[in-house]
Amino acid sequence: MAIFSNQATLTYNGNSTSSNIVYGELLEVLTATKTAVEGTYLPGELVTYVVTLRNTGTTALTGLTLSDDLGGYPFGTGTLYPLTYEADSILVFANGIPQAAPAVTAGPPLGITGITVPAGGDTVIVYQARVNSFASPQDGSTIVNTVTVTGSGLAAPVTATETVTAEAAPALTITKSVSPSQVVDNQQITYTFLIQNTGNTPVVATDNAVITDTFDPILSNLIVTFEGTPWTQGVQYNYTPATGLFSTVPGQITVPAATYTQDPVTGQYSVTPGTATLTVTGTV
């Protein structure tokens, strides 16, 4: 709401006198809200935003422009944008009725022009943005995102802000290798399982991570280590020699969280995965 004031001056015969000051309030007819459907984000994933413009006036508001700062934040002497508009993702509804897509400038910042909000009604704008390498993946990090609506019929720009938080979760991959790759009967062979965590939280015992494998050919006389520490059958792992079925006991596999580094020049984040290694050696 904008408060205005003014005062009159009366002059006569070289004299001057001032009136009282009067005050008024310029009521805003347009309000805006912004909501992220997901609420959290992951690197490389899409965030869906819903912007609702509500017109409480008796006249339609036309030719409005919406600008989205795509989460821009200062870095060095410039600005970094952790979100990238996803091309052709925009949908517009006026009082629930689909509308033609408006003109879009991907930016950053994102610009959407030619928006109309009906009298006594609302216009909903839905679009997506992809999380890029300028967004921090660290646990607790946020992207604060603001839209600004301008245009004729508005006393002042109208803004709305939404915050999404980096999703706190591990993200695991596993790679298996064998050495040697060519063996003969009664020769030892070693399988190595490399587990990598690119997520921002560790895998702990209560996550109950389990590795299972069926060795073919079947192995005997197993020697199992995890991160260089010997494991005992029936305690940290189980093995059925008749079938070759191997499995770790739930909760024995733990993996540290990844670490993230922001380049001091480019501002881009890089990831160093947390790792854990399981080795299984046996006789063919």
Regions inferred by a protein language model and the residue ranges of each:
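Exported/extracytosolic protein signature
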Residues: 1-284
